[in-house]
């Protein structure tokens, strides 16, 4: 007869014995997240479940798949989000970018476009924190749009989702005039792959991460074109900490925009705000 899980204690004991690939605080974290996001839903309406139902989840973790993908959920800005293969797992640095926007525009009613939304964390948090803002989100990946729409429903916020390629000319006609544009674009150079974790390289979508070495500003230039076309007066961008000089040279050549760089909590230059210069 198969071993069964019927409560938290039986789950904890089984996981402790089976999950030899993690230890210490990380193991405690894995146990809690999997209990909440995997085991509890499987137990609904049942007295117990076979451990055979849980073996595939542990096998995915043994292969190095990120916990957020295996559990199907992560938190961003204290808010739950569904994630899975096909969307980037949101990072804490992006929370700081969102916080900057909220800090700068606390008393305004804005129309906002997020470019490259992925799982939708940026537009959803902005809309949740500022319900009177009109928020649009543009994403090229159909799988990402599907997950983002689910997250909008999960968090009960209306977002205008746009399935569009940033580099397609139609992108400029899909969205009305915007006050503010935000983006966390691909910015990691191919030559920086050695800095990435094996888990990230093997499982997260590389199209959301990497840009060619010879043109690291590719997405930033295109986003700026959209900002100009949408007559946006403010632009917030997440940055590659290793490209500060390249960004500084780029903004020095921009006409009509003033730039402000900001460091993250680790002291790394990770954010940029561009504002239309006033006469």
Task: Mark where each language-model region is.
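Conserved AdoMet
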Residues: 32-103
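A general structural signal for well-ordered alpha-helical segments in protein cores
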Residues: 12, 27, 31, 54, ...
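Mobile active-site "lid"/loop adjacent to the S-adenosyl-L-methionine
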Residues: 187-218
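Conserved Class I SAM-dependent methyltransferase catalytic core
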Residues: 213-274
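Flexible, glycine-/basic-rich loop-and-beta segments that form/coincide
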Residues: 278-279
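Conserved SAM/SAH cofactor-binding pocket of Class I
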Residues: 96-195, 222
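A short N-terminal interaction module
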Residues: 2-54
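Proline-centered flexible-loop/turn and helix-kink motifs
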Residues: 20-24, 131, 157, 205, ...
């Amino acid at each position: 007869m198969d071993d069964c899980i019927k409560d938290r204690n039986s789950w904890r004991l089984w996981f402790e014995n089976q999950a030899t690939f993690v230890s210490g605080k990380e193991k405690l974290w894995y146990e809690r997240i999997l209990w909440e996001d995997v085991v509890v839903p499987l137990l609904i309406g049942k007295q117990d479940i076979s451990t055979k139902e849980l073996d595939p989840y542990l096998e995915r973790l043994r292969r190095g798949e990120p916990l957020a993908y295996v559990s199907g959920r992560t938190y961003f800005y204290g808010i739950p989000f569904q994630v899975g293969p096909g969307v980037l797992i949101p990072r804490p640095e992006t929370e700081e970018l969102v916080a900057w926007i909220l800090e700068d525009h606390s008393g305004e009613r804005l129309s906002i476009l997020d470019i490259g939304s992925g799982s939708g964390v940026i537009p959803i948090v902005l809309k949740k924190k500022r319900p009177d803002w009109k928020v649009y989100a543009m994403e090229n990946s159909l799988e990402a749009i599907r997950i983002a729409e689910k997250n909008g429903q999960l968090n009960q916020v209306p977002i205008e989702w746009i399935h569009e390629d940033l580099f397609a000319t139609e992108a400029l006609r899909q969205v009305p005039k915007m006050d503010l544009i935000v983006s966390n674009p691909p910015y990691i150079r191919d030559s920086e792959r050695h800095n990435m974790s094996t888990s990230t390289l093997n499982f997260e979508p590389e199209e959301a991460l990497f840009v060619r070495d010879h043109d690291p500003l590719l997405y930033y230039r295109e986003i700026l074109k959209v900002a100009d076309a949408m007559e946006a007066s403010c632009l917030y961008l997440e940055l590659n900490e290793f490209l500060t000089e390249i960004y500084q040279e780029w903004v020095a050549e921009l006409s009509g925009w003033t730039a402000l760089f900001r460091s993250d909590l680790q002291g790394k230059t990770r954010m940029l705000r561009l504002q239309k210069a006033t006469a």
